[in-house]
Amino acid sequence: MANKIKISGSEPVKYGPHDFQLGDYVYAPVSLNDPSQGNQLAYIDQQDKEGCTIIFAQTDRTVYREYDDLYLVPITEEWFKENPQVFTPSDDMKPLEGNPSFSYQYKFTAKRFSCEYRIVVYELYYEDEEEYQRLCREGLNYFTCLDESRGKATIAQIAAMNPVSKIPGRYICKPTGVMQIVSIHDLQHFLRLCGCEELKVPQTLLEG
């Protein structure tokens, strides 16, 4: 079984029914009796106070797992590349001075609000303790599967593009931070709020 990791300065978060929605992607142990089988990607089909019924994406097998058995799905670029019905590559945002450079960025439209958002992604390797400490001071709690995160923390920040002035032919827009996320299920929640289509499981993750 993969391990949850704790970044210094943050306290473990206990997850429960209020943290998840139907359709959310999670990692869960294939077998509770044989940890050597590892975790597989699954989605939540039903919920109650103690746990949820999940369906493994690769096998369609249905099992019940308590919330303590679940692990967050780290953000990787496959989720953006393989969901073009939601995301479009972008390159028009630059990091603030002193911040890490973006690993990649995308844009998407909130159909419900007629608003366009940018999502920029940082990738930080676990040994980069100084950067972690700074992010923790800014309020970041980061937990995920150690194996599935490929040795790095991925932090995505969503920004709304707000027009602040107009010059002939175009608006000058300023990005305004909306939220910071570290897991796919949090991204799913925001996209649902925006009226976007549901994310499909990247084929590369199913084949891995």
Map each language-model feature to its residues.
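Mixed-charge, Lys/Arg-rich low-complexity intrinsically disordered regions
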Residues: 2-20
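Short beta-strand-centered aromatic/proline hotspots
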Residues: 34-48
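Acidic, proline/glycine-rich low-complexity IDRs
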Residues: 182-208
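Acidic, low-complexity, intrinsically disordered interaction modules
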Residues: 57-61, 94-178
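Intrinsically disordered, low-complexity, charged/polar segments
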Residues: 59-87, 184
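Short aromatic-glycine-enriched beta-strand elements
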Residues: 52-53
